[in-house]
Amino acid sequence: TVSPSLINLNNGGVSPAPKTVQEAMKRYFDYSNEAPSYYMWRILDQGREPLRKNLANVAGCSPEEIAINRNSSEGLETIIFGLQLKAGDEVVASLQDYPNMINAYKQREMRDGIKMKWINLELPSEDEDYLVRQYVNVFTTKTKVVHITHIINWNGQILPVKKIANEAHKRGIEVIVDGAHSFAHFDFKIPDLDCDYFAASLHKWLYAPIGTGVLYVKKEKIKTIYPLFATNENPLKDDIRKFENLGTRPFFIEQAITKAIEFHEMIGIERKEKRLHYLKNYWMEKVKDIPGVKLNTSLHPKWGCAIGNVGVEGKKPNELDSFLFTNYKIHTVAITWENIVGVRITPNVYTTTKNLDVLVEGIKAFVK
């Protein structure tokens, strides 16, 4: 059901849901409104446990480690504000992390006196030792937590999460992973990352309805985290469901996630990953040798998948972004964040090579 009037190359923000997902959401919405309090809580809410099992299957973990929420920011802030940190405890994070997470840590720093240790990554990078070293070099005996973004949203850089996590755990440091852009994007299971906490938005690469997310908490860690929304029971109880006390929520959206999982499994994660990487490299290979063009994303599958970023010397990102939309009706997003300057291009499985040929034509015309 994608728009025929423009070429959407900003799927990294929110991906369109397949028609089957949209139809399920509308059907559940109509159903809810027949008698809201009855159908929402007594009928639709009964589908949460089967949904939890289905999400756990995609994640490769126990259903008792999966909480269903609204987006990755909510999931990550549940952990950031729920961790029992005290004044002087150190947290390591990157300036390339997502702004909501940076702001959350700054708020804890202001309110609770924790100490933030910020690293600044030079990207793109295919040097695993360099990337791991940037984190490890700032670990101290006071470091309690390291926050790692699996895929940097600004340019699509994949970080070696497991290597960093291994080094952190050797030192007794807990590991939080921002998986907003990695979950259902390429082939991995959450336990493979050796992290303690992981959160993702399902409306990105799982193609679920807008406003759906998942939070993973390693089983033995659940009892150590306070929920973001209070419960009427012990907040440190050993039950993942304590993180779902959101009050009235859109059950019709939540239950349509199942159709997104079916669509995802129909494609298959291996085939999906190959398709997404192919599309990214298709356009990047065609523009990389144009004078003045700078690629801000690796072409190697270990370090990038669907998300790419391109800059043009002497031009601001918003100039290229505006040019592409005004002249070619291509929707992208201009990025100027720390040392990443360019336009983010994010195709999806439905994107055609003809769409990307138009993009290449537009970049060539802009450079002239």
Task: Show the residue positions of the predicted features.
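Pyridoxal 5′-phosphate
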Residues: 1-368
